[in-house]
A protein has these predicted regions:
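A short acidic, Gly/Pro-enriched loop at the edge of an enzyme's catalytic core
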Residues: 82-93
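Conserved catalytic loop of SAM-dependent methyltransferase domains
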Residues: 40-41, 166-206, 210, 226-230
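Short, glycine-/aromatic-enriched active-site segment of Class I SAM-dependent methyltransferases
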Residues: 124-146, 152-155
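A short beta-strand submotif of the Rossmann-like class I SAM-dependent methyltransferase core
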Residues: 96-99
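C-terminal lobe and adjacent flexible extensions of AdoMet/dcAdoMet transferase-like proteins
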Residues: 213-239
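A short glycine-rich, Lys/Arg-flanked "PGG" loop and its adjoining helix->strand segment in the class I
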Residues: 108-123
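Conserved alpha-helix/loop element of class I SAM-dependent methyltransferases that forms part
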Residues: 10-29, 44
Length: 239
């Protein structure tokens, strides 16, 4: 997965969404990637914001070891999103990218804990899988047990005390073909096969999909897309 994460168009698009949503910030600010995985997002943040104070946590020790290999200079800790080992108001920005969808995660508790560690006025950047009709073998393969709609995400965040600033679906262009692929994959799942959709693509196809995603990102800066395979939110802690 780490090798795919480096170049795969979807990860590239998500990282662009995140960086675009973090800006503007002062030259020095603090970021927590709560569920940092193998560290692809932390590496991107180090390139984009060289003086940022980066921290990553993950429940997997293997993920933390992979992060260390990237030499991002981030503080790395093994921890879960239910009990973040930081004081209240410790961070300017918290990222949670496709973590709350996972088995064993209480999304409401994670939202409240994220709110606690943000400073007043701090920003949460959140990405979650969208729409139950897009559930397929990919979800089973990556351990995702829930998908969300925009109203559900708004209710979740506002219930934790956040003010929602931006809430949009994304990857709208590819939703119809992905829906078909996921429907077919549910038949495979019935036969006991569960494989992630994220596999290496021919370079020309990967580049074309990255281009489509970049165009959509430009559009989503000015409007909220009505559907997509993921829902993306930016929310602030009052203060």
């Amino acid at each position: 997965m780490r090798s795919v994460e480096e170049s795969y168009w979807w990860y590239q698009a998500l990282r662009r969404h995140v960086v675009d949503s973090i800006r503007p910030q002062p030259e020095t600010f603090s970021v927590l990637d709560a569920g940092c995985g193998s560290g692809g997002m932390l590496a991107k943040l180090r390139r984009e914001f060289p003086r940022a104070d980066l921290t990553g946590i993950d429940a997997s020790e293997h993920a933390i070891e992979l992060c260390r290999e990237r030499n991002t200079g981030a503080q790395l800790l093994r921890a879960g999103v239910h009990e973040l080992p930081f004081s209240a108001g410790a961070f300017d920005v918290v990222l949670s990218l496709d973590v709350w969808v996972n088995a064993g995660v209480d999304d409401a508790l994670a939202a409240h804990e994220t709110h606690r560690v943000l400073r007043p006025g701090g920003k949460l950047i959140l990405n979650l899988a969208a729409f139950d009709f897009l559930r397929g073998a990919h979800d089973e393969a990556v351990g995702a047990v829930r998908r969300y709609t925009r109203p559900q995400v708004r209710a979740l965040l506002e219930g934790a005390g956040f003010a929602v600033e931006r809430l949009t679906y994304w990857n709208a262009t590819l939703t119809p073909p992905i829906a078909l692929v996921r429907w077919l994959s549910r038949r495979q799942l019935a036969q006991g096969e569960a494989r992630s959709d994220f596999r290496p693509l021919p370079p020309f196809l990967n580049a074309a999909l990255a281009g489509l995603a970049a165009l959509e990102l430009t559009a989503s800066r000015h409007l909220s897309l009505p559907f997509g395979t993921s829902v993306f939110a930016v929310a602030r802690k009052h203060g």
